[in-house]
């Protein structure tokens, strides 16, 4: 996955349509097709690493292809994929995805709207059971009986997708930067 070492604004749209796979120790795999992303880089005031390196954001400075997981509002976790060469803090927030199946732990109110089960960064982490313990994990296929998170697919077939680029949402600084991408018309795209 050498292509993850590119700038986050190039990686973010390339992730659309790819499948994020979450494997549990019992062998269960849940696949989520990525439908919405946002890019964050060192010179961006909305980036967690904008001012300096801290204990919280240090994963963003690490090698590309690792997970940067953080908590928002004290309640929800967000999944980011670190990009750019080591030492340059940047990441792509996975804002929303379409699950291939609804795991048993998905709340009953989401069972009627399966496309909405991971339609937002917090919902995505809940659906894939990703939390702070996954911070720093490397994206790599796991052996049977082991936990893992990895990507499947290739950005090369994206010509078939209707990709929309717009400004990021849910932030106050850098909100004018058009670094949000999503698959147009997809029902799993976040609502705000």
From Swiss-Prot:
GO terms for molecular function: alkylbase DNA N-glycosylase activity; DNA binding. CDD domains: AAG (cd00540). Pfam families: Pur_DNA_glyco. One of its GO terms (biological process) is base-excision repair. Its EC number is 3.2.2.-. InterPro entries: Formyl_transferase-like_C_sf, MPG, MPG_sf. Keywords: DNA damage, DNA repair, Hydrolase. Belongs to the DNA glycosylase MPG family. This is Putative 3-methyladenine DNA glycosylase.
